């Protein structure tokens, strides 16, 4: 071509291509002008809007793919998208009023029905059978004529269970009656040797009233009470618990990483508090150290002949452990500990969870444990 042919034609780039996004910027601009015609729409508004929508779509697709993989499905279904949104706290708040077509609903199964479905006879008996037995005994005692004396005894025994930590009735109540009021058991799994792992939901302020024999307190080397779990325990236990921790600091000294120390739980419903020095995320062999920490907590509970112990989520305060990694390491360590030990005094292990994201992660990881 000669030079007289004029300028070479350039292919016109779309607004989306110039902005580096996939979603149509021009269409979003038209929608914004159509819906908000009274206001001035800047040129960057639809670009930013397209970028945000694209990021959210990619995030949901990634989480839905993880849900499909965990459920051993090759394709992503609307159900997986619903689970992905429900398991992410921020997405759940953002899309709270959104209905996903053909996504179904989130299961809220009562613990009694869940126990029947899985066939754990021991759990269904402990939950269902005691109330009718007690009522039946009261009715038969009334026929014999001893109404007042026999009706008064069960009331006093119920009140004394949380306080008298040295009696055997407390250990039976923690294992049979569950962790108490304000705690919801979402699901459970029985291991080979009979230990039960239970996902328990509650508010962090109720941790002091949890009826277990041992509560794990993730802390630092100085056994301080500055994190959320420590503050909740101090608030529930009061000055008595604070003095007990001070005595433990003097006698035990600073804890090594993964070391566990046991103290009396003065002012709490539990018998003992197991303080453990958890590692910092990003340090050398932090996952191995966290696994060792959990095993040391279980060994400390077994040394005290405890029958039940409660683990709060280990991404606690300054250690910055990712929730998914911490849940995987926790379940792996507990399963390995009970596989290696031929006999253990522990019968119930509770995972005390406070937010929906942690619950979703533990449900997925428990399902993987079932598959193994």
UniProtKB/Swiss-Prot annotation:
Give the span(s) annotated as Disordered. Answer: 115-182
Q: Where is the Histone H2A domain?
A: 2-117
Q: Which GO terms describe its cellular component?
A: Barr body; chromatin; chromosome, telomeric region; extracellular exosome; nucleoplasm; nucleosome; nucleus
Q: Which PROSITE patterns match?
A: MACRO (PS51154)
**Where's it found, cell-wise?**
Nucleus; Chromosome
Alphabetical keyword list: Chromatin regulator, Chromosome, DNA-binding, Isopeptide bond, Nucleosome core, Nucleus, Ubl conjugation
A single Gene Ontology biological process assigned to it is: brain development
Molecular functions (GO terms): chromatin DNA binding; protein heterodimerization activity; RNA polymerase II transcription regulatory region sequence-specific DNA binding; structural constituent of chromatin; transcription cis-regulatory region binding
User: Does Nucleotide-binding count among this protein's keywords?
Assistant: no
Predominant place of localization? nucleus
Q: Where is the composition biased (Basic residues)?
A: 135-161
Similarity-based family: Belongs to the histone H2A family.
Q: What does this protein do?
A: Variant histone H2A which replaces conventional H2A in a subset of nucleosomes where it represses transcription. Nucleosomes wrap and compact DNA into chromatin, limiting DNA accessibility to the cellular machineries which require DNA as a template. Histones thereby play a central role in transcription regulation, DNA repair, DNA replication and chromosomal stability. DNA accessibility is regulated via a complex set of post-translational modifications of histones, also called histone code, and nucleosome remodeling. May be involved in stable X chromosome inactivation.
What is the recorded name of this protein?
A: Core histone macro-H2A.2
- Could you tell me which species this protein originates from? Homo sapiens (Human)
Q: State the taxonomy lineage.
A: Eukaryota, Metazoa, Chordata, Craniata, Vertebrata
Gene name per UniProt: MACROH2A2
């Amino acid at each position: 071509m000669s030079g007289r042919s004029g300028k070479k034609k350039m292919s016109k780039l779309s607004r989306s291509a110039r902005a580096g996004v996939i979603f149509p910027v021009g269409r979003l601009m038209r929608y914004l002008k159509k819906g908000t015609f009274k206001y001035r729409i800047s040129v960057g508004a639809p670009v930013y809007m397209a970028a945000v929508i694209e990021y959210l779509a990619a995030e949901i697709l990634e989480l839905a793919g993880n849900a499909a993989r965990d459920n051993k499905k090759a394709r992503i279904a609307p159900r997986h998208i619903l689970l992905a949104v429900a398991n992410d706290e921020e997405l759940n708040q953002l899309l709270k009023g959104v209905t996903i077509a053909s996504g179904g609903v989130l299961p809220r199964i009562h613990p009694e029905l869940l126990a029947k479905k899985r066939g754990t006879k021991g759990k269904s008996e402990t939950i269902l059978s005691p109330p009718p037995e007690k009522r039946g005994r009261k009715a038969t005692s009334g026929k014999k004529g001893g109404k007042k004396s026999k009706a008064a005894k069960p009331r006093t025994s119920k009140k004394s269970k949380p306080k008298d930590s040295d009696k055997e009735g407390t250990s039976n109540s923690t294992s049979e009656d569950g962790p108490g009021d304000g705690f919801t058991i979402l699901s459970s799994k029985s291991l080979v040797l009979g230990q039960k792992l239970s996902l328990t939901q509650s508010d962090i302020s109720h941790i002091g009233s949890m009826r277990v024999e041992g509560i794990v307190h993730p802390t630092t080397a100085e056994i301080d009470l500055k994190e959320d779990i420590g503050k909740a325990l101090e608030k529930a236990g009061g000055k008595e618990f604070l003095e007990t921790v001070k005595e433990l600091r003097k006698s035990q000294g600073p804890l090594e990483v993964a070391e566990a120390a046991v103290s009396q739980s003065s002012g709490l419903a539990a018998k003992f508090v197991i303080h453990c020095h958890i590692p910092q995320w990003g340090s050398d062999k932090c996952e191995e150290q966290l696994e060792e920490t959990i095993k040391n907590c279980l060994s400390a509970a077994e040394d005290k002949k405890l029958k039940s112990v409660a683990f709060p989520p280990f991404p606690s305060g300054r250690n910055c452990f990712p929730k998914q990694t911490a849940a995987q390491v926790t379940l792996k360590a507990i399963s390995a500990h009970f596989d290696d030990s031929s006999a253990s005094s522990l019968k119930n292990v509770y995972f005390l969870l406070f937010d929906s994201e942690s619950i979703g992660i533990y449900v997925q990881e428990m399902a993987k444990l079932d598959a193994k």
